[in-house]
């Protein structure tokens, strides 16, 4: 299992983004993704960090591709995403 740390910017409030993110928890879990943390940067509420445990990289990548429209709708600015994976 890997731990993935993602940071990115959002185009709306953290509360709006978080509500959207949380509404997809069941399908994230079905894709082998277990969110551990989500929060805004202390000095910039439009910069977000999420930490997720991933059981299968291929399933996680497929989830991101399949749900790209939903991710964009949440306010996530995809081109600002930085991803780091840890063993």
Q: Language-model segments: which ranges?
A:
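Short S/T/G/P-rich N-terminal loop/turn motif that feeds into the first structured element of a domain
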Residues: 1-71, 79-87
């Amino acid at each position: 299992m890997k731990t993935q740390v993602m940071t990115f910017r959002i185009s709306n409030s953290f509360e709006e983004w978080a509500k959207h993110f949380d509404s997809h928890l069941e399908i994230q879990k079905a894709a082998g993704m277990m969110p551990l943390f989500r929060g805004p940067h202390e000095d910039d509420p439009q910069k977000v960090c999420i930490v997720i445990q991933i059981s299968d990289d291929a399933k996680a990548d497929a989830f991101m591709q399949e749900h790209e429209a939903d991710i964009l709708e949440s306010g996530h600015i995809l081109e600002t995403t930085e991803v780091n994976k840890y063993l």
